[in-house]
Swiss-Prot record:
Lineage of origin: Viruses, Duplodnaviria, Heunggongvirae, Peploviricota, Herviviricetes
Gene source species: Epstein-Barr virus (strain B95-8)
A Pfam family the protein falls into: Herpes_UL73
Name this protein carries in UniProt: Envelope glycoprotein N
UniProt family annotation: Belongs to the herpesviridae glycoprotein N family.
Residue ranges that the UniProt entry lists as topological domain Intravirion: 91-102
Purpose: Envelope glycoprotein necessary for proper maturation of gM and modulation of its membrane fusion activity. Also plays a critical role in virion morphogenesis.
Amino acid sequence: MGKVLRKPFAKAVPLLFLAATWLLTGVLPAGASSPTNAAAASLTEAQDQFYSYTCNADTFSPSLTSFASIWALLTLVLVIIASAIYLMYVCFNKFVNTLLTD
């Protein structure tokens, strides 16, 4: 029996490249190099509220629209997808090798 070599990730590589390109061009806005005075004032006010003794986990809600939270979620999704692809590949190869050797 000849071994058939296939490229299992041939379709995934262009999709990952497009996703990375979209992320780098779409998430980073061109004109947002520095915050305005109103944004800086609201940031200072938010920091004062965050560090006050009345702020605890019950009263402070994290924002899912910040760059850091979006980046963390995308990283989490990427790690989950990469782990799933790796585990499928390893399990499939082990399964095929077990079938061929027995």
